[in-house]
Amino acid sequence: MSDADDNNSSGRRPLSLKRSGGGTVQQSFARGRSKAVVVEKKRKRVATPAKDGGPGGKQGGGAKGGESALAAKARQLGLSEEELVARQRAIARARAEAADREAQKKQDAAAMAQRAASEQRQLEEQRERVAREAREAEEAAQKAIEDEARLKAEAEAATAAKDSGRKRDDESSRRRPPAKDEKRTPEVVPMDEASALEALGGRVKRKGGAAGPGPAAKQQPARAKTDNRRRGKLTIQNILEGDEERQRSLASVRRAREREKQRRQDTSGGREKIEREVVVPEAITVADLANRMAERSVDVIKYMMKQGQMVRMNDVLDADTAELVVEDFGHIVKRVSEADVEQGFIDDDDADEAKLPRAPVIAVMGHVDHGKTSLLDALRSTDIASGEAGGITQHIGAYQVELKGGQKITFLDTPGHAAFSAMRSRGAMATDIVILVVAADDSVKPQTIEAIHHAKAAGTPIIVAVNKCDKHEANPQKVLTDLLQHEIVVEAMSGEVQSVNVSAKTREGLDELTEAIALQAELLDLKANPERSAEGIVIESQVDKGRGPVATLLVRRGTLKRGEIVVAGAQWGRVRALVDARGQQLPEAGPSLAVEILGLDGAPDPGELFAVVDSESRAREIADYRQRKGREATGGSSPASASLEQMMARLKQDETQEMPLLVKSDVQGSAEAIKQSLEGIGNDEVRARIIRAAPGGVNESDVLLAKSSGAPVFAFNVRANKQARELAEREGVEIRYYSVIYDVIDDVRNTMEGMLAPEKRENFIGYAEILEVFNITKTGKVAGCRVTEGVVRRGCGVRLLRDDTVLHEGKLKTLKRFKDEVSDVRAGTECGMAFEKYEDLRKGDQIECFEVIEVARKLEA
C-alpha cells in the first residue's frame, strides 16, 4: 500500500511546509499594463517560557536532563525549590505590603489635606460670617441715616409746596375780590402726576426745581427728528437737557409706600418696648444674657462688636460687662452673687412650742489608752475595744444607748491619738456634753489637755470620768488636782464640773456616770422640732466596695426619711437606705440619732453640715457651687511676690525636697488624720506632699496616679484589688498596708530622715610643728614636721597657722616617715608633710589636723 493510500485512508493531509502567509497583488504599470505579484508575509515567532507543570515545562528552557526553570534557578542560587518559592512569596508579600503602605500613606495624606482644607474653609466661613454681620450692621445704620434724611427732605418739600400754594391763593384772592354775599369755598387745585407721586413717596427729577403753578417755562427750540429706537432710553443729551421728567418705577413707589407705612407704625402704632428686670450673676454667657433680656443674641453680639469686642454666643461675660449691656438695652439690672444659692439652705431656729425633748449627744474624749472605748463597751455591754487594730480607736463611732429608766443617750467615741485632732474637734462641736476620760494611774496627758481646749472652744459642758480606779497605783485625787492647772474645778473642790470615779473593767461607778449625764442633760433642756426637714452634721464618711459612698450623719433637728434629697458638703444624692449602729434598716431617723446613709454621689468631708432640699436641681446647684469653690481654693495660683523677702522665701521653698505620698483609708476621717500628721513631720529641707488622701480601696487609677507622681501608696485598713496589684507589680509601684497609724507616721519619718543631708562635724586629731622646709623637684615644697599632740593621718584636713592666724585650710597630700608613705604618725614622731595646691610654708608654722565626720540627722518629734 502506498503512502497516498495511507493518507487517504486515514483522512490526513500529506506533510508539507506551510508558508508563513501571503497573497497576490495586481501591480499596475505605465501605458495600461498590469502584473499579478505574489506577496509573502513573514511572521516572527516569539518564544515564551512554559508555565510550571505545563506540557512543555520539562522539555524547554535548555536545562540539563529535562530540569525545570524553577529548579535551575534554585540550583543556580544554591537553594532548594521550596526555599526559592518561599523567597519569591516573601518578596511578593513585601512588595504588596510596601504597595499597601504607600497607598495608606497617600490616603492619610489625602485625609490630612482634606481635614486641613475643611478647617481652613471653616475658618474662612467664620471670618466671612463675622465680616458679613459687621457689614449688615453698617448697612443697617447707613440705611437708617438715609431714610431719616429722605423723610426730612420730603417733609421740607411738602412744607414748601404748601407755602407756595397758600401764596398763590392769596394772590388770586387779591386780583379778584369776592362778592359780599358770596360764600367763600375752598378752591380745589388739580394735582398733577408728579405731585401725586411725591405724595406717595416717589421722587421726580426736574431741571427747574419743584413743580408748581408759576410763570411759564422758557420754550426750547424744536429739536430735529430723532431715531425712535432711542426713545425711552437715558442718553447723555437727555441728561444735559433735562427737560423731560424721569420718574421711579411702580415697584419703587410701592416700596416707598411700605417704608412710610412701617415708619408710621413704628412711631405711633408700634408695640412698646417692655422693660424687664434682668438677674445678672458673676459670670454669664452671651446667649443666656440675651435670653434673659428677651433679645436676639445677634443684637447683643452686634452691640459688643460696636464696643470693640468680638464675642460668640457661648462666650462668658463678667458681671460688670453684662450690667452695661443690660442698661444699654433699656432693662433693669439685678446683681446677684454665686453664694446666694446657699441662702435658705440652713433654716432659722424653730419656735419653742414646736420643739420636743430629745436625747443628749455625748462625746467621749481623752488621751490614748485611757479606756474611752472600754468605758463605752461597759455602758453598752459590748466588746468593741478588743477588735480594734493596736487597741486604739482610729475613727469616730456613734452609738445610742437606752438606760434602765428608758432614757436614750447618743455616744460619740472619738480617737485619742495625737493624729486625730480634727476628729476630736468635730466631736466637741457636734455634741451637747463631753465626758473627759482620764486614767487614774496616768493622770493628765497632752491629748487630755487638747480635749479640754476643744470642749471650751465649743462651749460644751464637761463631765470628768476618772477611769481605771480598780488598779493599785490609781490616784484619783492627783487627777483632780492636775485638772486645776487647766481651769477644770470639780464639785468636790467647790467647782461646777461633775466628776465620777469609774472602772470599765469592774463596771464600778457606771450608774453614777449615767445619773450625772441625765442631770446635765436636764439642766441643758435639750429640745428639737421633729416635724421639719432634717439638718445635722457629717460625723464620718467612707467608700464601701459593695455599697458605694457611705456617710455617718448625726441628725440635730428634724426627721430624715428614706427617699429625701440630701446635700452634705459638696456631695448630694437621694437617701436610698438608713442604717443604725446595729446594722438595722430604718424608715426614718429623728433628732439626736446617728445613722449611715447610702445614695450620695461621693464621700463628703467629715464636719460638713447636711440638710434636706426640695428638688434635685437645687441640690445639684449647691453641690456644683461648693465643688467649684473647692477647686478654686486648692488650684488657685499664688499671687506674685511683692518684695524681695517673699521672692527669696519662695525660692527657698522650691529647694525643699518633697516626698510624694498617696493615702487610701477605710474612712475619710482616717485619711484626713494621716494627711494632717504627715504634713506636720517635715522641716525647711524636706516635707511630705500628699498627692491624694481619700477613702476606699486601692484601684488602678490610684496606681497610675502614683506611677506618674513617683509616689508609694499607703493603704490604711484597705486592700488593693487584683487588677491594681498586677498593675503595681508591672509598673514598679510600691503598695504598703497599715492598720495602726503609729506605723504610718514612723515609716514616713524614717524615710524623710534618710532624705536629709547629713550633718558634718569637725573632730580635732592633732598638732604638728614645721621644723624645716625642703624643696623637692617633682613634689614641690615639703615640710619636715614633728607631731606635738595627737595623731596625724594621711588625707585628713589641715589648717596652716602662722602667729595664731589661719592662712590656709585644705587637705594633706603626702605623709611620709623617712622615704615611706605611712597612714598615720603619732605624737613625738617626725614626718614629712605636703599640702594640696599650697606651698607657702615656713619654719615655725603650726599645722592643725582634723577630720570631718557625717552624722545622720533626726526630725524633731
Curated annotation (Swiss-Prot):
Region (G5) location: 503-505
Biased segments, Basic and acidic residues type: 94-108, 121-155, 163-186, 255-273
Region (G4), start-end ranges: 467-470
Binding site for GTP: 366-373, 413-417, 467-470
Chain segments carrying region G2: 391-395
Signal peptide residue numbers: none
SUPFAM superfamilies: Initiation factor IF2/eIF5b, domain 3, P-loop containing nucleoside triphosphate hydrolases, Translation proteins
Biased composition range(s): Gly residues: 53-65
Domain of life assignment: Bacteria
HAMAP family per the UniProt record, alphabetical: IF_2_B (MF_00100_B)
Annotated CDD domains: IF2_eIF5B, IF2_mtIF2_II, mtIF2_IVc
Region (Disordered): 1-69, 92-273
Keyword annotations: Cytoplasm, GTP-binding, Initiation factor, Nucleotide-binding, Protein biosynthesis
Locations listed in the record: Cytoplasm
Keyword check for Transmembrane helix: no
Region described as G3: 413-416
Protein name: Translation initiation factor IF-2
Similarity comment text for this entry: Belongs to the TRAFAC class translation factor GTPase superfamily. Classic translation factor GTPase family. IF-2 subfamily.
Region (G1): 366-373
Organism encoding this protein: Maricaulis maris (strain MCS10)
tr-type G domain: residues covered: 357-527
Ranges of compositional bias, category Low complexity: 109-120, 213-223
Function: One of the essential components for the initiation of protein synthesis. Protects formylmethionyl-tRNA from spontaneous hydrolysis and promotes its binding to the 30S ribosomal subunits. Also involved in the hydrolysis of GTP during the formation of the 70S ribosomal complex.
An example molecular function term from Gene Ontology annotations: guanosine tetraphosphate binding
GO cellular component, one term: cytosol
